[in-house]
């Protein structure tokens, strides 16, 4: 397969430049016959989750296509679902560069992107142009300059704008790169947010005559007590699913490696065991009442199977896709 050669060339570039170059090429082919260049035939293995039927259990995690620019090209690669975003009500540049770093030996990435995106209105226009007929998740967050205490307003604005176009909506309260965001995972702040989101979901269902499930994306750095509280809140508020997990602040498995001290969230293989353990504990707490979408360090069929064995119904990849390319999609979907 050609990807090892592509990767070698891309890895000569700064990580964000490599990302921009790749998306420049994908934008050129998305929605055109040139999509055949990236198309892969993968088996159909339907999975039902959150009341939706997914073509196969492997999805693209949020963060790669933040603005929904390359939906059709990514679909052609064989994903069972795509999660675009994180998107915010207003456009924002994100944190200062450099803000994306490779840990090549560990097959990990550290990012402190900070929800750089062109805003929810732009994303909706891109979704309208796409021909994608699969399950599209839209991951939403708050603007950096919105005070945390007003954060729920940003989520409600985004929900209203994406509801008609989303297969499901993902609530990102677990990125470590927006100051104070993770505090929304705890106690009264979480309850207030989930109450507002559930009320908005019910209102939008009445307006649009369709029910769009909501999943909450959580961090891997929750302690036991916090995890129990989160599980309890999700169940009490009848949230439809949970995405476990986002990136970690833990550097214990990458000590001494180049870039290991960079600020930001660590993803890829060093996150694999930590995220799987969170899924296992979450599954025990949820007792099958709420589906889990497993994400974090999946870079092989075995890693995907481990997430499912721990309690995930669906799995997603991001960093593994950067390091292994489209062949990883076919490999996982075929053998999972």
UniProtKB/Swiss-Prot annotation:
FMN binds at residues 62-66, 86, 139, 172, 217, 245, 268, 297, 318-319. The gene is pyrD. Pathway: Pyrimidine metabolism; UMP biosynthesis via de novo pathway; orotate from (S)-dihydroorotate (quinone route): step 1/1. GO terms for biological process: 'de novo' pyrimidine nucleobase biosynthetic process; 'de novo' UMP biosynthetic process. PROSITE patterns: DHODEHASE_1, DHODEHASE_2. The lineage of its organism: Bacteria, Pseudomonadati, Pseudomonadota, Gammaproteobacteria, Enterobacterales. Its EC number is 1.3.5.2. It is an enzyme of class 1 (oxidoreductase). The keyword Cell division does not apply. Binds 1 FMN per subunit. One of its GO terms (cellular component) is cytoplasm. Catalyzes the conversion of dihydroorotate to orotate with quinone as electron acceptor. Substrate binds at residues 66, 111-115, 172, 177, 246-247. This is Dihydroorotate dehydrogenase (quinone). Belongs to the dihydroorotate dehydrogenase family. Type 2 subfamily. SUPFAM superfamilies: FMN-linked oxidoreductases (SSF51395). One of its GO terms (molecular function) is dihydroorotate dehydrogenase (quinone) activity. Monomer.
């Amino acid at each position: 397969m050609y990807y090892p050669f592509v990767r070698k060339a891309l890895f000569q570039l700064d990580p964000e430049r490599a990302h921009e170059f790749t998306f420049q090429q994908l934008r050129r082919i998305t929605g055109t016959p040139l999509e055949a260049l990236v198309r892969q035939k993968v088996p159909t293995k339907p999975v039902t989750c959150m009341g939706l039927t997914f073509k196969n259990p492997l999805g693209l995690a949020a963060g790669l296509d933040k603005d929904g620019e390359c939906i059709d090209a990514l679909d052609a690669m064989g994903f069972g679902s795509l999660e675009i975003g994180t998107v915010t009500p207003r456009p924002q540049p994100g944190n200062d560069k450099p803000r994306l770093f490779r840990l090549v030996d560990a097959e990990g990435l550290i990012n402190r992107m900070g929800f750089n995106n062109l805003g929810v209105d732009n994303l909706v226009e891109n979704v309208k142009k796409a021909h994608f007929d699969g399950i599209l998740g839209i991951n939403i967050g708050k603007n950096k300059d919105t005070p945390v205490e007003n954060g729920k307003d940003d989520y409600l604005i985004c929900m209203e704008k994406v509801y008609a176009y989303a297969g499901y909506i993902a609530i990102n309260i677990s990125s470590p790169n927006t100051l104070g965001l993770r505090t929304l995972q705890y106690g009264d702040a979480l309850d207030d947010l989930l109450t507002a989101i559930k009320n908005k979901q019910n209102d939008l269902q009445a307006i649009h005559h369709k029910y769009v499930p909501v999943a909450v994306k959580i961090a891997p750095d929750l302690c036991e007590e916090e995890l129990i509280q989160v599980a309890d809140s999700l169940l009490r508020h009848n949230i439809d699913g949970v995405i476990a997990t986002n990136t970690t602040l833990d550097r214990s498995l990458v000590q001494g490696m180049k870039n290991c001290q960079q600020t930001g969230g660590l993803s890829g293989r060093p996150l694999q065991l930590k995220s799987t353990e969170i899924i296992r504990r979450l599954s025990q707490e949820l007792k099958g009442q709420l589906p889990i979408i497993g994400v974090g360090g999946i870079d092989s069929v075995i890693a995907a199977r481990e997430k499912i064995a721990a309690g995930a119904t669906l799995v997603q990849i991001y960093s593994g896709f950067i390091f292994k390319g489209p062949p990883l999609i076919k490999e996982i979907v075929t053998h999972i």
